[in-house]
């Protein structure tokens, strides 16, 4: 008989007392449910002084925003905990610390990050963290290299691919990224005024062929252990620090996917800034986002190359020049997945505050149109641009990258 039951606040406190690794467990007395997640219960566990000490996170057996009609496997909690533990093995400074997890209860206790802030909120507010982009690039390089064929033995890698098979969560990604936005589907969510742009995407054969290729690679290329949902809402920042959280979508997939979704969220903020700030601040913020895009990729690529030169285990993959050649393919994937993120976050099920929190309706629509046009352009141009500087130059030169005009 399964031990699983949905935690109450009292259950979360008791669990934290047992497994929170705090000096005085009995000082933990209250639990506040937090977060806007659709897949989990998340509790902040506070002590008698009201200070949050640890986080208790439990997977729900269904998608919360839909209900029990959309069931989900609880094994994703094990996959999330083990993904974070594996990533922490190679990049502890940028991965949230898992203190304990129980696969049967689908629960995890992790360090409290109350002294950090969600990066998306900070980007929207115009608060700049100068080391964040470089730290994100470092995290991506360390985690993706060390779980790839460049570092793992073939036997270990094949076993890991099996252990991290995550079909139900991957199905969500497959549908929301690569299928729903390009067909009429009840999960899609967009302002009816955008229908002409949406229909144009659905009727663009070249775009749909490119998206089909991206989906095929997502389905078939087990290159490294991905976070699987790396965006500015799953990244916490503080002065000089960055931590990733929420890895329940972890699986072995194409390396460019994690990079592309990260870059896509920087560009979603880029698209939304004219509606979030005054003209001068928006222009400065947009330039910084483009610099961040360059920094993330350049840091990732430089570190991945250095790691391959120092640590590549397979003699064939250690061949001089191969890692650089491989990164060209990763780059093209990343730009395609980046474009997919822009489109699906604008007209699909799950939106972002970078666009949706814009108060002025006409400006919001203009920013959404920009995100759609930029996403489409990136998907189509991905096979033809060899470096990040070329992509940034095209964004700067494109009329759609200028401040959106009111409709």
From Swiss-Prot:
ATP binds at residues 40, 57, 111-113, 246-248. Its EC number is 2.7.1.100. GO terms for molecular function: ATP binding; S-methyl-5-thioribose kinase activity. It is an enzyme of class 2 (transferase). Pathway: Amino-acid biosynthesis; L-methionine biosynthesis via salvage pathway; S-methyl-5-thio-alpha-D-ribose 1-phosphate from S-methyl-5'-thioadenosine (hydrolase route): step 2/2. It comes from the Bacteria. Disulfide bonds: none annotated. GO terms for biological process: L-methionine salvage from methylthioadenosine. InterPro entries: Aminoglycoside_PTrfase, Kinase-like_dom_sf, Methylthioribose_kinase. Homodimer. This is Methylthioribose kinase. It comes from Yersinia pseudotuberculosis serotype O:3 (strain YPIII). The lineage of its organism: Bacteria, Pseudomonadati, Pseudomonadota, Gammaproteobacteria, Enterobacterales. The gene is mtnK.
